[in-house]
């Protein structure tokens, strides 16, 4: 039959690229699970009362090329002015070797959080380097592997200060008046839920205030002044007040380390180490503290440990502090950091080394000195005598200066009374400085850069002598070797090949949705139109961003069944926090602020109770029945017991147990009956899109993990995005922003992230995904995700029982394999299976969550039947190996499972095992071999001997 032109144009071509199994493979799998079609399968599995009659109207699909052209036209509406606004954001020069070999490399950006250290040694080493940079620059003992942004780090510093404070009755937190306004905004939001009083005043007046448990100072103030806080910190420490200092990472190259001045906590943004501004993010924050406070620190910490052979190996240390274990008692609700961005900053430091970084920092400071000298020579007054890269210039005709700046396509900071702020950066040239002279002084200023340079080179007093760093930084060999592009490229490749990412194999992690991050989706994030905008630029310069964000928000509204979407939260955990704050403020607006009880099912992810606690709520756990569903009887009893104090329930759908609960609408009705709100965790949205929606089910608010369902890559542990969808009555209570008015959001609430739209520069990824898939593709993606999970469950259930199923023995988009009977029978654990899968070339499924002794498998729609069969064959082969142990062929203490994973060096070492080398490293004829570089890690050793800085190179050899 002759095809029509429309058929030949094939606007839905990307759908077939994104979805792994083709039509024939889908039919084979449907036959295997006993279903006639995708619609028939989802019709059987999804409760009838929540199935959408028609898919959400998000438009027809577009080809990759058409979508890219459409988005390019939108991006072109952004105006790329040169921004000297500062306030924690500067233009950067990302070295092309890092751009090409990391940011644009799926071997780096498609990896998952390194819970499985044996397949993560490369990015763990890069993160350890990041921690070493942090330690050297801050002068402290312990560093984390990044936080979400500088403002969030400030809020975490406040919370940590309270945890470690010996002044248990003190309830006030002091913030110096010259911290960045967005930092203060986020601190105030967090303080409100904790019940802390925030005092904002001149730093020198801090001792005038009583009952202060912690202080936040900023080493280089928001308008540029360098502060020597040595004496003040000493006085504060004598009064047992915990001192946190916000610092500029580039300034720290030249300035004395706050830790050496006595600070307890030091944090800041690593953005200017090579990460584009991106209209606000994503960026990594650094965070360091004294050794005595290490168990109270938030976020990931990479530690040096040993593997089973006694060799040096890296791992995430002290995970017992974190939300997935401690739940509401966790130090923080954060379950994602900013690994990809931290690693860019880390490798920026490696590539430039201490000499290169000092050259960059000195050049920035020299140009600032030259600018200052010229302006003062012409009679303008600087508000601060001591500065690094930022001048606060008093101007008589401020309107005229700003008009000339706009005409020259320059952004100055304009919110300072009778003055403008100018922040220079590594991209600033002498031509830029001459242009600034013209803007501030007029064209006939007569100044000469070289003459001014000679003057300031011999007589610069803009950094106090006491504030100049007198110690060496970055002395470890890793920062002093890889300075040619060839060496750097090879170093990065050596790290990459240690890790297992989606470019090598499926990552079947339950509750993580490790789907395709298509190249076409990733391309726009490095476009200058998106990458180079300052988050606080005038809104008329960001019309492209505003259009893209508005379109994406509109699509998400339609896909979720909500009335509004807030894009600010820059992780799923931040989304939970923002959604719960919206509920809290809604109740307060109705004079029901006493509603503070949050019901959470026993199966919930640990982030849920941690977020509830952060939001000032009390957690009450609701039981699950023997089938893993919410126990309605217990729910009613707990809701009735809470009564007028019921705030909300947090529920995941499909459930964390991997099934569509039949009674989800009844759950919503019970909570609403008692005046509560329904928070539906969007972690499993990949099984809802196009089939049902949170709003249709009856929920009031959800966060959406754009890094799961909507294709933003996990980056090895971040970035993520967690926008929240809300019903109309909650819309006035979503986060606002003190610096930028968010168009279309009538909210006066505080911010939860530093930038108004969170990590805005990765939103084009989700825009591209939805645009290319269209309504039909999005629904089909959900259906194939469900098919793939059921195919795995049906083929593995005889070897590994599926713990929970719904109607007709079906699962949703993931399934839980119960290893407990096998462990009781043979002694082989889920950990042994997880590590043995590495020998077969796979990342392990999620271990012991949500049920201890299990493996949770989520294949996603992007995996082909060939890859699914490869995984299934590996699992069945492992089951056969377990049977060998059971039969006594291999002893329990010496077999391929308990010794897994196996590494190359074992092949040439003495072999004393009762199984062959071939069985060890080429099981079941594995062809495309992934080689881990370390054996199983010793977790106990790692936590007992915590060491979070770089080790000698010899340890890696």
Swiss-Prot record:
Q: Which domain of life is it from?
A: Bacteria
Q: Which UniProt keywords are present, listed alphabetically?
A: Oxidoreductase, Pyridoxal phosphate
* Cofactor names: pyridoxal 5'-phosphate
Listed GO cellular component terms? cytosol; glycine cleavage complex
- Enumerate the SUPFAM superfamilies for this protein: PLP-dependent transferases (SSF53383)
Can you provide one Gene Ontology molecular function annotated for this UniProt record? glycine dehydrogenase (decarboxylating) activity
Job description of the protein: The glycine cleavage system catalyzes the degradation of glycine. The P protein binds the alpha-amino group of glycine through its pyridoxal phosphate cofactor; CO(2) is released and the remaining methylamine moiety is then transferred to the lipoamide cofactor of the H protein.
Q: What is this protein called?
A: Glycine dehydrogenase (decarboxylating)
- Give the originating organism: Escherichia coli O6:H1 (strain CFT073 / ATCC 700928 / UPEC)
